[in-house]
Swiss-Prot record:
This is Beta-glucosidase A. It catalyses: Hydrolysis of terminal, non-reducing beta-D-glucosyl residues with release of beta-D-glucose. Belongs to the glycosyl hydrolase 1 family. The gene is bglA. One of its GO terms (molecular function) is beta-glucosidase activity.
Length: 448
């Protein structure tokens, strides 16, 4: 097989999120987040796990940066815990929380690692949830206030910014299915939440521009390609609708200033029509510097008149594929097709893959190594498709591998390992897996 080489300025990174790695949930003045409350409620998280300690990154960030340097990570994408900065979501600033992120950012820079900050990765201050959370439009203003503090303190040294991580997951899993914090199960609420998340993105981008910050800003969506189960018109239409609800519902407002028609029509049929000031979409769709997405898998969709939405997963197709430990199918071509779709339908934007990776059951072997060959194969296959898209003219600028560390995988607790670095959750000892050493070579050679 011929060698695959990426463009010379391609950014090789890895990613984490505050609640999944930091621990120190009640230290140095940090306020309670909705994930603290949710994980402390029995029955919400597998095995009663919580993020109270997680990887203890809050106390071990120096060691973690050493590991990044050893692997050769060029850029590290991390999120800031809003309740560390504003324990009540608004009002009194917690200087100790801010100082932690300043130390972290400066140490990354000293080690030649480019910091990339996500402003919101799901850990809303509980005090704001008590006032209605993301369903309450006021939260978008509190978010702007919080963003301003971060921009003021880190804007001149951080080159890459993400407003939100996966608003679709916050809306769907947090407010419709109720399996993520804050555990609400209501369709109308989930749609109002999705709108307010996007509105807060727009407000933060507007502020970022007004502050003349010399850096790039975008948003990280969760996207997968939705394939029709067959060439029948009804399956094709079902897959298009499914992708509209999960993908275009976020892509279109941000990049086109409107919601997709087929999705609006479906919600109208269910008796739900969103009402909001007409300026909202103008705010939401301000120009961004790149569109980012997290991609792990693909969907196969069939027409299903018995389902509420008129479609369902094509299980007979899905069962043919190899799956990761999350039960997600491994289908690398889906990444290529998704990149081509974004390039074609949204005017050749700059694109960042903000997360990609796989969970497998990793164990330290008798030789002391973690031989995660399945993960290496997964990464190789997905990166091959990313490279293929670049060859075909897609403006893909960066790749952030999920994740640097094994961590708290939300409702699954510590049972799903995504890291290229193994974490023993009893001793908190870190150990680079074979995939970490493989990634080191990829970065060094700018390909494989």
């Amino acid at each position: 097989m011929s060698k695959i080489t990426f463009p010379k300025d391609f950014i090789w990174g890895s990613a984490t999120a505050a609640y999944q790695i930091e621990g120190a949930y009640n230290e140095d003045g940090k306020g309670e987040s909705i994930w603290d409350r949710f994980s402390h409620t029995p029955g919400n998280i597998a095995d009663g796990h919580t993020g109270d300690v997680a990887c203890d990154h809050y106390h071990r960030y120096e060691e973690d940066i050493k590991i990044m340097k050893e692997i050769g990570i060029k850029s590290y994408r991390f999120s800031i815990s809003w309740p560390r900065i504003f324990p009540e979501g608004t009002g009194k600033l917690n200087q100790k929380g801010l100082d932690f992120y300043k130390r972290l950012t400066n140490l990354l820079l000293e080690n030649g690692i480019m910091p990339a900050i996500t402003l919101y990765h799901w850990d809303l201050p509980q005090k704001l949830q008590d006032k209605g959370g993301w369903k309450n439009r006021d939260t978008t203003d509190y978010f702007t206030e919080y963003s301003e503090v971060i921009f003021k303190n880190l804007g001149d040294i951080v080159p890459i910014w993400f407003t939100h991580n996966e608003p679709g997951v916050v809306s769907l899993l947090g407010h419709f299915l109720g399996i993520h914090a804050p555990g609400i199960k209501d369709l109308r609420t989930s749609l109002e939440v999705s709108h307010n998340l996007l509105l807060s993105h727009g407000k933060a981008v507007k502020l970022f521009r007004e502050m003349n910050i010399d850096a790039q800003i975008g948003i990280a969506l969760n996207l997968s390609y939705h394939y029709p189960a067959s060439e029948k018109a009804e399956d094709i239409e079902a897959a298009e609708l499914s992708f509209s609800l999960a993908g275009r519902w976020y892509l279109d407002p941000v990049l086109k200033g409107r919601y997709p028609e087929n999705a609006l029509k479906l919600y109208k049929k269910k008796g739900i029509e969103l009402s909001f000031p007409e300026d909202d979409l103008k705010l939401i769709s301000q120009p961004i510097d790149f569109i980012a997405f997290n991609n792990y898998s693909s969907e196969f969709i069939k027409y299903d008149p018995s389902s509420e939405s008129g479609f369902s997963p094509a299980n007979s197709i899905l069962e043919k594929f190899e799956k990761t430990d999350m039960g997600w199918i491994i289908y690398p071509e889906g990444l290529y097709d998704l990149l081509m779709l974004l390039d074609r339908d949204y005017g050749k934007p700059n694109i960042v893959i903000s997360e990609n990776g796989a969970a497998f059951k990793d164990e330290i072997g008798s030789n002391g190594k973690i031989e995660d060959t399945k993960r290496i194969q997964y990464l190789k296959d997905y990166l091959t498709q990313a490279h293929r898209a670049i060859q075909d003219g897609v403006n893909l600028k960066a790749y952030y591998l999920w994740s640097l560390l094994d961590n708290f995988e939300w409702a699954y607790g510590y049972n799903k390992r995504f890291g290229i670095v193994h974490v023993n959750f009893d001793t908190l000892e870190r150990k680079i897996k074979d995939s970490g050493y493989w990634y080191k070579e990829v970065i060094k050679n700018n390909g494989f």
